[in-house]
Amino acid sequence: MAIKHLFTSESVSEGHPDKIADQISDAVLDAIFEQDPKARVACETYVKTGMVMVGGEITTSAWVDIEEITRQTVREIGYVHSDMGFDANSCAVLNTIGKQSPDINQGVDKADPKEQGAGDQGIMFGYATNETEVLMPAPITYAHRLMQRQAEVRKNGTLPWLRPDAKSQVTFQYDQGKIVGIDAVVLSTQHSDSISTADLREAVMEEIIKPVLPAEWLSKETKYFINPTGRFVIGGPMGDCGLTGRKIIVDTYGGAARHGGGAFSGKDPSKVDRSAAYAARYVAKNIVAAGMADRCEIQLSYAIGVADPTSIMVETFGTEKVSQEIIIEAVRQFFDLRPYGLQEMLNLLQPIYKKTAAYGHFGREEFPWEATDKAALLRDFAGLK
């Protein structure tokens, strides 16, 4: 690893057009799962000025009101008036949902549920590092926290002129792999026409940036770029169209780990793009929590209709405290990475997905794949004290 280097990650707010789409897709999934946890769902959403189109393939015994789910999701995000460029109450909602292909279904559903095949081929990665308390890379962790704070002060009235669309980016300085400071912070937020650029920049610094970023990492050399274009009134779906699955690096590790390319939102857990990526994070996090390595990346791969992974790779970047052979054997013994096994292991057949669709799928303790309940087992297995 370079002795000194910079690393940057970005996040986007719940009001970013792509995140609106992700949240609608996952809200549909959750609504269906409340009635039918065995449903097959692949829900895609497109948003643009004045309209939302929801499509995809869904096979279920449930009935859900797609239009009302869509409007309620947009409402909760905060687009409730045409002044913002998008209004949950008046936008058009188009529904183009069909059923899952029986050709796919025959490869997934088996007489013995434990032999459930993967819903598609693909590669998935999971990652963990001990540089933060949530075992996530610091740049993406703090980029998300800035966006969560933006939503908080927007919704609680502290900064009532804020609007839902926003982005953040944080550049960390590292020395021999350890954080030594924050080099740069970028935060752009949509706002009403009533606020001056100078007042906005001061308020964002005092109410969003300073409460979130640890003071010991900030210095006179830290650079701040707050609404660097000077004006951000037109935003949300009026500024850009949004699509489900277009923020896959924001959703995962901010570029600090590899990505298999598959998006998460709108997909039920039979889609290994989602469920196996969650399982890979769970494995990597437990390895790091057990003290077996400081950093760990897991790769899984699958073939459509086949239960067992076609490959499992463990990479610890030279930070392992026990041999690679012990780590690999521990993964084999303590983690069932077949589609049915990982659904059961992580209790994935429940309506928990809308919450994942903004501010990252990882590093948030409320999700089952963030548990470190196998760490003690792994420690004992590896002979670590």
Swiss-Prot record:
Q: What is its EC number?
A: 2.5.1.6
Details of cofactor binding = Binds 2 divalent ions per subunit.
Q: Print the keywords alphabetically.
A: ATP-binding, Cytoplasm, Magnesium, Metal-binding, Nucleotide-binding, One-carbon metabolism, Potassium, Transferase
Q: Where is Mg(2+) annotated to bind?
A: 18
Where, subcellularly, is it found?
Answer: Cytoplasm
- In this chain, ATP is annotated as bound at 16, 165-167, 231-232, 240, 246-247, 263, 267
Q: Name one Pfam family in it.
A: S-AdoMet_synt_M
Q: Which PROSITE patterns match?
A: ADOMET_SYNTHASE_1 (PS00376), ADOMET_SYNTHASE_2 (PS00377)
Record's superkingdom? Bacteria
Q: Which reaction does it catalyse?
A: L-methionine + ATP + H2O = S-adenosyl-L-methionine + phosphate + diphosphate
Record-linked NCBIfam families? metK
Protein name, per record = S-adenosylmethionine synthase
Q: Which organism is it from?
A: Vibrio cholerae serotype O1 (strain ATCC 39541 / Classical Ogawa 395 / O395)
Gene that this polypeptide is encoded by: metK
